Amino acid sequence: MNIFEGKLIAEGLKVGIIVGRFNEFIGSKLLDGALDGFKRHGVNVEDIDVAWVPGAFEMPLIAKKMAKSPKYDAVICLGAVIKGSTSHYDYVCSEVSKGIANVSLETGKPVMFGVLTTNNIEQAIERAGTKAGNKGYECAVGAIEMANLIKEL
């Protein structure tokens, strides 16, 4: 029996990070967490590219562009969609999550979903590093593991 597990050593990996500008104060905290995660695991700052997009809905297009490039081993998408009083939230969350998943399946590269989908601002703040960890950091570690696992298989 063979067992494969992605290593958490990131030296030599090149990564793309996409951050939504909408709810930027949350996106910035998620970005800080992701950068910390990549640096702690050995990614050189020069091997990290950050692309800012208007909001979560625009992420799948840029994720596809990055993932199709041989330059990147992994891509992470970071941002926050916070529920309001209309159904807009449901449409955005659904399309963004499907779009990001499709990019990963189409390109064969890990594209991590670090878009917080919360009922209120307090939940978003908690998941951006104040109480419940930092989803950006978690996505960075997940991207490292998946990129290495793909190389191993």
Swiss-Prot record:
Functional pathway: Cofactor biosynthesis; riboflavin biosynthesis; riboflavin from 2-hydroxy-3-oxobutyl phosphate and 5-amino-6-(D-ribitylamino)uracil: step 1/2
GO BP terms: riboflavin biosynthetic process
EC number: 2.5.1.78
Enzyme kind, highest EC tier: transferase
Binding site for 5-amino-6-(D-ribitylamino)uracil: F22, A56, F57, E58, A80, V81, I82, F113
Keyword GTP-binding: no
Gene3D superfamilies, A to Z: Lumazine/riboflavin synthase
Record keywords: Riboflavin biosynthesis, Transferase
GO molecular function terms attached to this record: 6,7-dimethyl-8-ribityllumazine synthase activity
Active-site residues (renumbered): H88
Recorded superkingdom: Bacteria
InterPro entries in UniProt: LS, LS/RS, LS/RS_sf
Gene Ontology annotations for the cellular component aspect, listed alphabetically: cytosol; riboflavin synthase complex
Binding site for (2S)-2-hydroxy-3-oxobutyl phosphate: S85, T86, R127
Recorded catalytic activity of this chain's protein: (2S)-2-hydroxy-3-oxobutyl phosphate + 5-amino-6-(D-ribitylamino)uracil = 6,7-dimethyl-8-(1-D-ribityl)lumazine + phosphate + 2 H2O + H(+)
S-S pairs: none
Family of this protein: Belongs to the DMRL synthase family.
Name of protein: 6,7-dimethyl-8-ribityllumazine synthase
